[in-house]
Every structure is written in C-alpha cells, then in structure tokens.
Amino acid sequence: MEKSAIRMIAQMISLNRIEVLFLKQYYGGYSPKFYLRDMSNNSLKEIKIADKYEDDRFIHYYFNEIEIDFCRVYQIVDAYGLSETLQYSKLVYDEDFLNMNYYDGDDLGNNYHMEYTEFKVWTPTALEVKVLITKNDTTCSSNMKRLDKGVFYAKIEGDYDNCRYVYLVRHHDEYCFTVDPYAYSSSSNSQSSIIINLDKT
C-alpha cells in the first residue's frame, strides 16, 4: 500500500500494548472507539483507549492490557468501519516477547522420512507461513501451523528426497519468499532449500 493511501496503522509494540496510528486527514485523526477483531471467528470486542499523542501526520492511540493469542490473526477496526491487520513486526524490539518465544530446540529445518517430511521454522513475528515444495517441476503449497515459541510446523505426506522448497512468510498484508535458514542444503543459486535424506550422507 502506498504511503499516501495509508489511513491507519495497527501494531503490537509490546506483549500487551497496541499502538494505532490514525491519519489526521482521515476524520481529523479522531475515532471515539476502536475494536479488536479475531479473524479466526470474526468476533469483535471494544478496546479502551489508554492514552494518545499527535505528530505532524498522525494521532497515535495506545491500548494497554490487551490479551493476544499470537497463533491468530487480528484486525483493528475504527468507529467508521475501517479495518487494518494488526502487525507483530515491532515485537522484535520487545525483550519480554523475545524471551517468551525463545526456542533452543535442535529440530528446526526439514526432517526427511521416506513417507513424509516435517518442516519447522522459527519466525515469531510472522502472521502466517506456507511451505512450497517443488517436485518434478510441480509446486505444491501447504499452510504451516503456529506452535509455541513462535515455531511454525508442517508435516507433508510423500517422498520428497532431494526436492526444492521455500517458505512464503506473511508480515502484515505482504508476503515474501525466503529460504530455510536451518536447511542442510540449498540450490546452486541459493534461491531455494533442498530436502536431504541424511541417511545417504
């Protein structure tokens, strides 16, 4: 979205605190109420404004003690019906969030079996992750499930030895392709990761 078109930005800035930037040119930067929408069940609840301040362009609204399940996607809705996806990206600067999502497991990456392959990637600020596997020039996409500690997981049935894969990661309303930082091997151009049968090595 172009900056000129942005009317509202919604972001978690700590574990239980939300910041909403409301464009002054949109209703004078004023909304008497805001709501939190849980996209898993479309439920809507009002959240109370704790404090606010303004800069040259935006009114900044703050909301405290907001309980968020990071396995879900949320929207902030203003009093006029405008909705905006709640971003988690700024939580990389929050020590409490990073401590809560600290993961020291040794099972990240791909784990090959002849009948299936498991995928695990640590990306705690992502809203959604898909794994895209290419076999015989055909690419299939599968949603990954968010587990504890910011780990996303998928188990894909079938034999995918030596197949290429990438992750499609969603932050806010944008998606980006990324290789697996925990993979044992990657393609020659480093554009994709490779599933490896370690029993052959």
Identify the function of each model-found stretch.
Residues 16-20, 115-119:
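Structural beta-strand segments of beta-rich domains
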Residues 32-68:
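Acidic, low-complexity Ser/Thr/Gly/Pro-rich repeat segments typical of extracellular/periplasmic
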Residues 122-126, 136, 147:
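A short, compositionally biased micro-patch
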Residues 37-39, 77, 122, 132-134, ...:
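A generic structural motif
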Residues 22-31, 122-129, 160:
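Short proline/glycine-enriched turn/loop motifs at strand-loop junctions of beta-rich domains
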Residues 2-13, 25-39:
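Short, basic/aromatic recognition patches that contact phosphate-bearing ligands
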Residues 27-43, 128-134, 139:
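Short, surface-exposed alpha-helix to beta-strand junction/turn motifs within ectodomains of secreted
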Residues 2-10, 53-118, 139-141, 147-201:
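The feature marks proteins involved in alpha-glucan
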